[in-house]
Each structure stands twice: as structure tokens, then as C-alpha cells.
């Protein structure tokens, strides 16, 4: 049994590195019925960047008809603000 077909999106972001980023992003997606298809992330060492940047790419799907992209973006803006993300 596979996941329901739906719309697929890719979220890319960067922010100062600190604990809780992966948890916050994945929790947001779960709360919005998203299925994470792939996720990559890495932290840039502080010697390369003064604030130690964190980078993440998440490929996810939401069940059809799913939530409109604008609604997901509005909701995610709260997560982005909390971590000072560029996305």
C-alpha cells in the first residue's frame, strides 16, 4: 500500500545553525499531512561562516487535493521567523 497521490513540493532553506531546526520543519510538515519523500541537511562550520549556517532541502508531498501552497507558505512563515530562515 503506497501513499496517496498528491502534490509534490521542494522546500529549501538556510538559517543560523542551532538545535531544533529539523524538528520544527518536520513537525510543521506532519501537522499539515505532508509526507517527506527526501531530506538533506548540513551545517556549515563556524570557521566558514560567522554564525554557522544550516542548510536544508526537503522534498515532500501533500495528499490531493491537499492544502493550497499559499496556506502552507503562510503557516511556515512562523517557523521561518523563529529560526531567522531564508527560504
Q: Where are the model-predicted features located?
A:
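A conserved regulatory-domain signal marking ACT and ACT-like small-molecule sensing domains
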Residues: 1-87
Amino acid at each position: 500500500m503506497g501513499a496517496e497521490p498528491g502534490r509534490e513540493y521542494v522546500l529549501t532553506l538556510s538559517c543560523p545553525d542551532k538545535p531544533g531546526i529539523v524538528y520544527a520543519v518536520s513537525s510543521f510538515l506532519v501537522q499539515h499531512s505532508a509526507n517527506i519523500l527526501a531530506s538533506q541537511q548540513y551545517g556549515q562550520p563556524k570557521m566558514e561562516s560567522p554564525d554557522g549556517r544550516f542548510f536544508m532541502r526537503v522534498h515532500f508531498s501533500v495528499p490531493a487535493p491537499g492544502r493550497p501552497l499559499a496556506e502552507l507558505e503562510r503557516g511556515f512563515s512562523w517557523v521561518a521567523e523563529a529560526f531567522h530562515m531564508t527560504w
